Swiss-Prot record:
MF term (GO), any: nickel cation binding
Identification of the protein by name: Urease subunit alpha
Residues that hold substrate according to the record: 221
Protein family membership: Belongs to the metallo-dependent hydrolases superfamily. Urease alpha subunit family.
Cofactor(s) the protein needs: Ni cation
Annotated gene: ureC
């Protein structure tokens, strides 16, 4: 005779199931379970007196006979494609299956075999997401990587060589020699890395040599001169080598206006950093570029979301990052032209509409590398409070909004930079770069960060304690950070040309090199849940922004979730 559990008891034992709702941290966002892969009564769970024991939920099958290396049990997956409860099997560092784990000898519908070779990670009552991807990183210091990993970000794309003036401002790793040194440095970090070369040049040769050296793309930045000629030449080289171009356009409109830049693109795909403009770009109307089909638009986290403090902090940040001086009037005017409350407010709404597709950090160059994820969800919360439930939601939940926002720092940057076959979502075959969150700490502090199938960072207590939980509990590096495990669980992204030239062998690299691909044919329609193409108008006098004729405006937030409740500093 079967035993029937009430919903409350079931949720506390195996986690929520279909129809149950989960609050995300202290936000006003609630997600509802859409599907559960469990066979009720045959769920697996590890522990004393629990199911994953020999002859019960654990089979006698070997790894060679199909047992997985790691199983995450009863996790609530939140990804762009769905919100589902499932077990996740990991094998050879990749997601092997999403479904029902257990012992096929005695249980039905088993798609993930647990055996003596299987480690168990408890996902009951936890939310599982793909590791975050930050696609706008100034590699100013290596300590950024620890901070990013601890926040749930497992891939960094950007440029730089350290705390040089060029790196502080422009996200470029310029030239083959610098690219090779950064590729060698990448071997020391348990994170996926990809580097952008300098794209500012009016002749192809100097740009092509950077791609051949291993750059996964090129960055055009106004501080190096983003002229129409440089844009045209850079995109021409990118077309030849199937790499992405990221652009920070001309704030001062010296070489042309936003229309000039759009014309120079010639309908070729490009990743626009700072699409709103506070971080840089044609003043005051770079924001209108998000309505172009060939533009993959992102913005960075210092303006996410618009608050009562946003404008005040930006001026000082901008002066430092772009090597400006307060005693030079022209420098001050340059800085002030970029900070506009109207376009920052519109940025909130354009993210909520899915017109802006990606959120990244702009690390130490006006952005915070450890806050990509929490600021994304703060924006989602603010929009829920100010704009209500999204049209298209089914049921009394925020599932569509949650999927839209998680896509902004996972699958969409992966697609944009040609790495979505490897990472960017919780899907079979991809690297097992995953984050496990307690719902109360969702988006703020992950419980576990899994890199290539093994725990890389975790909330860990006193190492001299008798159990793992005594205070102080804080995020600390785990075994994936050491020795050969780094190369076994992370990859470095390079161009197809560099991969074919065996650049790894020539430089003595230990990490696997993965070539970026399928980039130049992209359009905004390829981005998930964030592909709205509005006609944007910006009033040159008032800076008011309209999308398809509708005025986009909202009030700054004075209080946010996921903030001081969770942090001492």
């Amino acid at each position: 005779m079967s035993y029937r559990m009430d919903r409350h008891s079931y949720a506390h034992t195996f986690g929520p199931t279909v129809g149950d709702k989960v609050r995300l941290a202290d936000t006003e966002l609630f997600i509802e379970v859409e599907q559960d892969y469990a066979t009720y009564g045959d769920e697996v769970k590890f522990g004393g007196g629990k199911v994953i024991r020999d002859g019960m939920g654990q089979s006698p099958l070997s790894r060679a006979e199909g047992a997985v290396d790691v199983v995450i049990t009863n996790a609530l997956i939140l990804d762009w494609w769905g919100i589902v409860k499932a077990d996740v099997g990991i094998k050879n560092g990749r997601i092997y299956a999403i479904g029902k784990a257990g012992n096929p000898h005695i249980q039905d519908n088993v798609s993930i075999i647990i055996g003596p070779s299987t480690e168990a990670i408890a996902g009951e009552g936890m939310i599982l997401t793909a590791g975050g991807i930050d696609a706008h990183v100034h590699f100013i210091c290596p300590q950024q990587i620890e901070t990013a990993l601890a926040s749930g970000v497992t891939t960094l794309v950007g440029g730089g060589t350290g705390p040089a003036a060029g790196t502080k401002a422009t996200t470029c790793t310029p030239g083959a020699w610098n690219i090779h040194r950064m590729l060698q440095a990448a071997d020391g970090f348990p994170i996926n890395l990809g580097f952008l070369g300098k794209g500012n040049g009016s002749q192809p040769a100097a740009l092509a040599e950077q791609i051949k050296a291993g750059a996964i793309g090129l960055k055009l930045h106004e501080d190096w001169g983003t002229t129409p000629a440089a844009i045209d030449n850079c995109l021409g080289v990118a077309e030849d080598y199937d790499v992405q171009v990221a652009i920070h356009t001309d704030t001062l409109n010296e070489a042309g206006f936003v229309e000039t830049t759009i014309a120079a693109l010639k309908n070729r795909v490009i990743h626009t950093y700072h699409t709103e403009g506070a971080g840089g770009g044609h003043a005051p109307d770079i924001i209108k570029i998000c309505g172009e089909l060939n533009v993959l638009p992102s913005s960075t986290n210092p303006t996410r979301p618009y608050t009562i403090n946003t404008l005040e902090e930006h001026l000082d940040m901008l002066m430092v990052c772009h090597h400006l001086h307060r005693n030079i009037p022209e420098d001050v005017a340059f800085a002030e032209s970029r900070i506009r409350r109207e376009t920052i407010a519109a940025e909130d709404i354009l993210h909520d509409l899915g017109a802006f597709s990606i959120i990244s950090s702009d690390s130490q160059a006006m952005g915070r590398v450890g806050e990509v994820i929490c600021r994304t969800w703060q924006t989602a919360h603010k929009m829920k409070v100010q704009r209500g439930q999204l049209p298209g939601e089914t049921g009394n939940n925020d599932n569509l909004r949650a999927k839209r926002y998680v896509a902004k720092y996972t699958i969409n940057p992966a697609i944009t930079h040609g790495i979505s076959e490897e990472i960017g979502s919780v899907e079979v075959g991809k690297l097992a770069d995953l984050c496990l969150w307690s719902p109360a700490f969702f988006g703020v502090k992950p419980e576990l960060v899994i890199k290539g199938g093994i725990v890389a960072y975790a909330q860990m207590g006193d190492a001299n304690a008798s159990i793992p939980t005594p205070q102080p509990v804080h995020m600390q590096p785990m075994f994936a950070n050491y020795g050969g495990a780094i190369a076994a669980t992370s990859v470095t992204f390079v161009s197809q040309k560099a991969a074919k030239k065996d650049i790894g062998e020539k430089l003595g690299l230990s990490k696997p090199l993965v070539a970026v691909k399928n980039i130049r044919q992209l359009t905004k329609r390829d981005l998930k849940l964030n592909n709205y193409l509005p006609h944007i108008e910006v009033d040159p006098e008032t800076y008011e922004v309209r999308a398809d004729g509708e005025l986009l405006t909202c009030e700054p937030a004075s209080v946010l979730p996921m903030a001081q409740r969770y942090f001492l500093f």
